[in-house]
């Protein structure tokens, strides 16, 4: 498949029934646990490094496939009893922050390994995607989620402060290539690079990082341990003198081949780059400091619930932005299907 890009000038549990008559519900722990459908917990919260905050992992294609094969109720299109709900609900936030109300995305190309070493052109693809995605109908489903509401809230309505989807959410790129990145960077090293990026971009206060995410992208062959076998990417946060800093570990996605999206759904060899990059971006906007934002009762975020769907409602597809054509997965919308919830490629 031929894909078009504009070169820049200079990256579980589901489908239930939600009552449309109520704007919020009691906290989830007080509700009886019900059979979960549509996805499951193959992705979600994991401890990657002792002493570090847990991360939200993006499951691989094969892990998701095996999970769905072993859990008939977790397959797309499954039906569950009307008494259950697998929609996202608010987990209270951290320091009053649960979503990114005016998102800013910074791309960090970490390490001298990037120098003349980008065989798939991932840097340009990511930059073009981030430059064009703000304000798109694909990302707009994040705007139904909010902060400043009670823990356990399912529907914001006009309450709280909603997540944003403004144009121009891409705030800059930093080629941090003066020295090499660790050959297999640990989570603590990735977190430290995110803090360095905050300083580089002048975000040195808690307020300046309150709606910001840093995508730490590593070059080919320079990926963290567990990539392509345990996960495709993950996002987390770290505390610093600049406040809490949200970041994504984005390895060189095409190194994983089909297990992280190459040719997924016939979308081309580079499809996984923006499927995974978009997944992490959408999750960070709605759960900036995991897992205090919007998740379901199984601990899945809006991207986890819709990962690697190949047919039917929510199947991954190409979208057209002003900066090119890019493959994306769908994102979970509580509002879909009159409040029953589901995976959507456009909103409203």
Label every model-predicted segment:
Residues 1-4:
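Positively charged n-region of N-terminal signal peptides that target proteins for export
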Residues 8-19:
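Bacterial N-terminal signal peptides
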Residues 20-92, 100, 110, 134-140:
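N-terminal zymogen propeptides
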Residues 27, 88, 98-113, 122-127, ...:
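Mobile, glycine-rich extracellular loop/lid and propeptide segments
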Residues 104, 113-176, 296-297:
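Active-site-surrounding "flap" and adjacent substrate/cofactor-binding loops of secreted or lumenal enzymes
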Residues 104-109, 138-148, 155-157, 168-172, ...:
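Structural recognition of the beta-strand scaffold that forms the well-ordered cores
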Residues 156-238:
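Active-site-proximal segments of metallohydrolase catalytic domains
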Residues 242-348:
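Catalytic cores of secreted/periplasmic or lumenal enzymes
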């Amino acid at each position: 498949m031929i894909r078009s890009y504009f070169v820049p000038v200079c990256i579980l549990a589901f489908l239930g029934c939600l009552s449309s008559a109520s704007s919020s519900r009691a906290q989830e722990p007080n509700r009886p646990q019900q059979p979960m459908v549509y996805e499951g917990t193959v992705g979600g919260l994991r401890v990657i490094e002792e002493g570090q905050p847990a991360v939200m992992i993006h499951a691989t294609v094969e892990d998701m496939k095996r999970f769905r094969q072993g859990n008939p109720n977790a397959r797309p299109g499954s039906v569950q009893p009307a008494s259950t709900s697998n929609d996202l609900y608010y987990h209270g936030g951290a320091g009053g922050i649960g979503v990114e109300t005016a998102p800013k995305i910074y791309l960090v190309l970490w390490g001298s390994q990037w120098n003349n070493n980008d065989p798939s052109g991932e840097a340009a693809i990511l930059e073009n995607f981030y430059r064009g995605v703000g304000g798109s109908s694909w990302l707009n489903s994040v705007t139904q989620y909010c902060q400043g509401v009670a823990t356990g809230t399912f529907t914001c309505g006009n309450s709280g402060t909603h997540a944003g989807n403004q144009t121009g959410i891409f705030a800059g790129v930093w080629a941090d290539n003066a020295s090499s990145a660790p050959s297999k960077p640990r989570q603590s090293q990735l977190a430290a690079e995110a803090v360095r990026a905050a300083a580089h971009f002048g975000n040195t206060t808690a307020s300046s990082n309150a709606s910001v995410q840093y995508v730490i992208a590593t070059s080919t062959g320079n990926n963290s341990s567990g990539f392509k076998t345990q996960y495709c990417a993950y996002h987390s946060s770290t505390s610093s003198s600049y406040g809490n800093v949200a970041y994504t570990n984005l390895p060189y996605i095409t190194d994983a081949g089909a297990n992280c999206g190459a040719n997924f759904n016939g979308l081309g060899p580079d499809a996984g780059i923006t499927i995974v990059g978009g997944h992490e971006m959408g999750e960070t906007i709605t759960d900036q400091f995991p897992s205090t934002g919007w998740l379901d009762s199984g601990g899945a975020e809006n991207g986890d619930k819709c990962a690697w769907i190949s047919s039917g409602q929510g199947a991954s597809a190409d979208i057209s932005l002003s900066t090119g054509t890019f493959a994306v997965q769908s994102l979970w919308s509580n509002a879909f299907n009159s409040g029953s919830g589901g995976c959507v490629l456009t909103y409203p």
